[in-house]
């Protein structure tokens, strides 16, 4: 149930999220030059124009490459910006790229399209020599020679090949086909199959749904530094239950059975293997006797030594193992415990440096900070890892490690220092000194550093200017790479008022309010609350203006959002306030903030308040409408209605195991409170949602009917969790707007 924003792929998708969902920054009101409508949000390129896709650095750090398509996405070129000069040139022409990297919108299968965009699957990969590229052209791999400007089809099997990886010496390419590992010499034609399992339940180096969605796993195999071996994760999903996803459009509907572990179900059984890339012999590694564990991250410390993170099922303990790849012997070198909380897995990932040290993010002092550990590089198995120093300190959250310049002893990271509603780029020395900001303008800043840490791409969503991407030298100048159209000026997007409230325990809650344009409101103003409310997303950040909020405001509504306890971006105490109890704390904070808002703004009509949200926001909408009488109307899009319907990793992380807290699960089940529904409900779901299953809404429909409650329903055939596509999105947001017009006026 995560909302994920990645820098490397799909800037156009990110820009859409910012325009439609993310909150607005402080900016001066401007007179619009273009009409703002729901249809305009989905014009080719959106409001700001189609941005670069698959932004990558060449391994030698000399080129920043990206795919730039026309507004419709039908034609594109692979460009590069020279790191030294900033000069931009075409690297692969449109005629050649059309076959090598087709537009993702041409993918017909909605679930595959969502996988490619949601999980940011890169369309091309640099070779270590920075002279070749491998393209994944909808399952067939092509090797492109930059010198001769020619492409050779590398795979041609009937089944698709994916997740390609060059060996560090550049001599071989590994890839996944039908859940098995393959390898082939770059200069040869003989393909070797390294693993030989059959069926759809055994994975070797491939990724299942729940690891991809909830542990952000994007690859499950890695080459050894000497290019001789590959470590991979074997996943056995034999005992994982299936969920049927039905395609209703053919005369005879078809069913795809998705492996999906729900709360209390068996998880995939996993183990690490090491395979010889030449001989294909596999050695299995034993890490723990506990079968109820996750192995979400692993890699190579050095030749012959593997690292692996192992987390227990309750997700409050994580062990870092070092493993002798030859003997399979392992030892725990570091343990992270979070009693009374959970492992904040979006951030806790070891990053190994070349000097026998590694970076380790931890919540241990109450905030997410960076710690530097060392080990004996000549004999990594000899002793536990040694804590050298805490690199960052203070009342803020480190959000991500972005890169490192090991020669200069510098680490780069993003954090929300001074304001949890902003994201900035920082650097700090490996001795913990000299922390400084690399960005300063109010807003959201994201970075992608070259391997040597000398240059970075800087993506900026600011309050006064359109979104942009620049190429920057560390400590030097930045050169523009791409600039969005100025949607703020063109469409007259306005900033909200940024507000602060106090929860019952005194905790500061951040909110935002957008009122109708001056002089357009007559009488009391109806209020719409846009909610997410869960552990995966903030609603109140200082990014680009929210266009849908502006559309609603021009219809005479006020739009409000507040980040309750349990949302990210704050300290451990704030985030874990919802542990073992979804709904109650969140709603309490929302209502407390609402009362304070109504007291501050008497022009708002407290008798006409609506609420709406998507995913967890849809769940919270249903919870609010069945556990209070404050809401006149609501829209719940793709909601979880019973936490037992959602996956193990996400739900058990926050709610605990079912056997330990049945009462907590029962109180969060909104189907059990259907008879208490207050207000006019619009319930929305896509039938092919493989994340939050359509089953959730079916159960809610049944409960509401039995309770004698009337409601509106919209089902989107074959649409996934994002309900994507121009036609579906225009229909959906028009229906949401219409629902509020009907019920609040």
Q: Language-model features: where?
A:
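Positively charged n-region of N-terminal signal peptides that target proteins for export
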Residues: 1-4, 745
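Generic alpha-helix initiation/capping and coil-helix boundary signal
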Residues: 5-11, 157, 504, 617, ...
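Serine-hydrolase catalytic core recognition
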Residues: 241-242, 297-299, 304, 309-311, ...
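Sequence-pattern detector for short linear motifs
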Residues: 5-6, 53, 712, 732
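Polar/charged alpha-helical tracts
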Residues: 2-3, 31, 84, 99, ...
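Beta-propeller folds
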Residues: 7, 11-13, 21-449, 454-456, ...
């Amino acid at each position: 149930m995560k909302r994920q924003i990645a820098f490397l792929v799909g800037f156009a998708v990110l820009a859409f999220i910012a325009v439609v969902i993310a909150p607005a920054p402080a900016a001066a009101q401007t007179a619009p030059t273009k009409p703002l409508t729901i249809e305009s949000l989905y014009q080719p390129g959106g409001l700001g124009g189609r941005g670069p896709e698959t932004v990558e650095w060449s391994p030698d750090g000399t080129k920043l490459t990206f795919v730039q398509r026309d507004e419709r996405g039908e034609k594109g070129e692979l460009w590069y910006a020279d790191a030294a000069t900033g000069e931009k040139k075409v690297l692969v022409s449109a005629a050649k790229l059309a076959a090598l990297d087709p537009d993702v919108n041409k993918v017909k299968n909605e679930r595959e399209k969502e996988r490619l965009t949601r999980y940011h699957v890169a369309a091309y990969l640099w070779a270590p020599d920075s002279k070749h590229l491998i393209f994944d052209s909808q399952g067939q791999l092509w090797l492109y020679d930059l010198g001769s400007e020619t492409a050779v089809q590398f795979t041609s099997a009937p089944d698709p090949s994916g997740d390609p990886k060059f060996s560090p010496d550049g001599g071989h390419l590994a890839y996944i086909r039908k859940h098995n590992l393959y390898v082939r010499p770059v200069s040869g034609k003989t393909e070797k199959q390294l693993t030989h399992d059959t069926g759809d339940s055994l994975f070797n180096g491939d990724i299942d749904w729940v690891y991809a969605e909830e542990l952000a796993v994007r690859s499950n195999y890695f080459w050894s530094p000497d290019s001789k071996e590959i470590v991979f994760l074997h996943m056995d999903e034999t005992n994982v239950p299936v969920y049927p996803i039905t395609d209703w459009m053919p005369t005879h509907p078809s069913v795809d059975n998705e492996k999906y572990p729900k709360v209390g179900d068996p998880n995939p059984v996993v183990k690490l293997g090491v395979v010889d890339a030449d001989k294909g012999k596999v050695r299995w590694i034993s890490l723990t006797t506990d079968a109820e564990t996750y192995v979400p991250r692993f890699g190579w410390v050095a030749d012959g030594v593997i690292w692996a993170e192992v987390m227990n099922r309750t997700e409050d303990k994580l062990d870092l193992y070092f493993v002798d790849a030859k003997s399979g012997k392992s030892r725990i070198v570091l343990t992270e415990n979070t009693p009374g909380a959970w492992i904040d897995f979006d951030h806790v990932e070891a990053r190994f440096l070349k000097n026998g040290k590694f970076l380790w993010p931890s919540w241990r002092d109450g905030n997410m900070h960076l710690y530097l550990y060392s080990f004996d590089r000549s004999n990594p198995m000899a002793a536990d890892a040694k804590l050298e120093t805490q690199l960052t300190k203070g009342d803020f959250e480190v959000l991500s490690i972005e890169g490192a310049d090991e020669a200069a002893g510098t680490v780069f990271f993003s954090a929300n220092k001074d304001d949890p509603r902003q994201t900035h780029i920082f650097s700090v020395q490996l001795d913990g000194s000299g922390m400084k900001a690399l960005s300063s303008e109010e807003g959201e800043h994201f970075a992608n550093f070259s391997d040597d840490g000398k240059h970075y791409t800087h993506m900026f969503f600011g309050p006064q200017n359109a979104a942009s991407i620049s190429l920057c030298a560390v400590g030097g100048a930045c050169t523009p790479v791409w600039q969005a159209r100025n949607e703020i000026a063109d469409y007259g997007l306005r900033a909200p008022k940024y507000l602060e409230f106090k929860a019952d325990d005194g905790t500061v809650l951040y909110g935002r309010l957008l009122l109708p344009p001056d002089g357009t409101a007559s009488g009391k103003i109806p209020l719409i609350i846009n909610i997410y409310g869960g552990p995966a997303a903030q609603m109140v950040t200082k990014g680009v203006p929210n266009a849908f909020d502006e559309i609603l405001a021009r219809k005479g509504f006020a739009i409000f959002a507040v980040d309750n306890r349990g949302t990210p971006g704050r300290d451990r105490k704030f985030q874990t306030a919802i542990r073992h109890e979804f709904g109650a704390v969140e709603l309490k904070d929302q209502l407390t903030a609402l009362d304070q808002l109504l007291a501050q703004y008497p022009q708002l009509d407290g008798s006409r308040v609506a609420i709406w949200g998507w995913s967890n926001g849809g769940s919270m909408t249903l919870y609010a409408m069945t556990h209070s009488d404050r809401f006149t109307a609501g829209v719940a899009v793709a909601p979880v209605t019973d936490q037992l319907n959602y996956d193990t990793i996400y739900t058990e992380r926050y709610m605990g195991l079912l056997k330990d807290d049945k009462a907590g699960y029962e109180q969060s089940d909104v189907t059990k409170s259907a008879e208490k529904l207050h207000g006019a409900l619009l319930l929305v779901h896509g039938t092919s949602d493989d994340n939050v299953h359509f089953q959730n809404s079916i159960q809610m429909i049944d409960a509401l009917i039995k309770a004698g409650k009337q409601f509106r329903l919209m089902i989107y055939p074959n649409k996934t969790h994002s309900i994507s596509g121009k036609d579906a999105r225009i229909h959906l947001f028009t229906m949401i707007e219409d629902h509020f017009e009907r019920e609040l006026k």
